[in-house]
């Protein structure tokens, strides 16, 4: 068995929120394997949350740019150290410039954007050099955390950025009537930003992951003293709740909590005689 260090225990506590003794025991029981220790704590009900809140979130800005015909778009996150700098004109303008460049050149990763050249406003420097220059000018570390480019083809992209530019989402719909679905697409982008789904529908959730979650729920129920005869029903109920949390089509619609997103899509198709499906989306929350 590997030696369990105090640092390992602290790291596990930071990840799970569980007590020090629970973390020590989990690592002992799993031979020091961090992922197995996390699963162990979840099964025992000792983990307080699957992920931490935004305590370690950096400051910065989420930027979204789309082409005029809404056939393509980008979403990016640029980080700095303080809210003061994030709200400043220099940082804001620089973020916008990066978004415009990424969209114009169809760039889909931070690494690819770094090699491109900015315009005269930034001395014709590469993005990499311009970030270094901006770091010196503002006196804070500036870093491009993420960047995603979406090409909708014959479909449409739409977006939503929450006031303050710390949260945004961009969504891709396949449709035979792009102009007709723009308002719906924006509502769905807002849904993604607010409700934080992970996948479009159940088919995107790996079967092995669901099996693992089901086993965790089963062990939790047994640890709570639930009777074996009721455990399967409890597991199914918790899986349904999980789907409602992470699957876009099964979430309740933010504009009408009596219907699900799937219902909204079906009703829209019937009412407007239009083909429309959600292909994908990207949600970006500062610091996550």
UniProtKB/Swiss-Prot annotation:
On whether Magnesium is a keyword of this UniProt record, the answer is: no
The UniProt keyword set, sorted, is: Cytoplasm, Elongation factor, Protein biosynthesis
Cellular location of this protein? Cytoplasm
Gene3D superfamilies assigned to the protein according to its UniProt record, in alphabetical order: 1.10.286.20, DNA helicase RuvA subunit, C-terminal domain, Elongation factor Ts, dimerisation domain
Give the top-rank taxon of the lineage listed in the UniProt record for this protein: Bacteria
Where it mainly occurs, coarsely classed, is: cytoplasm
Its biological purpose is as follows: Associates with the EF-Tu.GDP complex and induces the exchange of GDP to GTP. It remains bound to the aminoacyl-tRNA.EF-Tu.GTP complex up to the GTP hydrolysis stage on the ribosome.
The name of this protein is Elongation factor Ts
The source organism is: Pelodictyon phaeoclathratiforme (strain DSM 5477 / BU-1)
Q: Which lineage do the record's taxonomy fields give for this organism?
A: Bacteria, Pseudomonadati, Chlorobiota, Chlorobiia, Chlorobiales
